[in-house]
Amino acid sequence: MQFTDVHIIDAQSPMRFEFLGNINGSAFRPHESMGTHGGAQLVSRVNSLKKGPFSNRPFDCVVTTGDNTDNCEHIELEWFLKMMSGGTITANTGDPTSWEGVQTSGDRTYYNVDNSIGDNFKARGFPHIDDFFDHVIAPHTSPGLDVPWYCVFGNHDDQMSGTLPLWWTDLNKVFTGTMKFTGFLYDTNNQALARALNNGSSSLANISARTMNRSGSTVTADARRLPLHDQGVHGCAS
């Protein structure tokens, strides 16, 4: 059995690029806050199947072929391991009592799922769901796979958004801080960032942290967002 691109995500992380969603569609996904919940249901479904539909052969193992995390954060890996091996997951970072992601910002660019504001997604038929994020951040349980599992390393397990190198420390510092990254002061720098995300350009190397836009929102800092390489982690356990 194969899993791939599970992308367990800390959707409240300040080190994300949702504001580039009109350039890169994967920069914001309306369902991303439910990643661990969906993953736990995937595990339950595999456990219920037990064997292949054509061969009727019992599963020997599950192999997940990369991009187990979305943004190479330690907390994303922790949630992924609990999803695969079993355990209680609280899919929340920062403020322990509320959601601090873009979906509660009131910005019509994003899916404001549980408030009354109209947005681009609701205009296309996405529903309003009361108390959605209260349910998202409530503890839930994954049963863990009934068979052994193994995982392969992916680019999202090693780089910011699977594209930008962690050695670019100006952005690296944003992970565990309070400033929500919303781009740079100069449009040329934002264009360079978009190129880096879309085609792996290294043109960000000469951009200084002093040019970051610091007028955006703030979030509650969380040390668990530290990138994996800064924790000495260079892969994931099986």
Describe the predicted segments one by one.
Residues 79-238:
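Extended active-site neighborhood of metal-dependent phosphoesterases/phosphodiesterases
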Residues 1-84, 91-116:
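N-terminal active-site segment of His-dependent metallophosphoesterases
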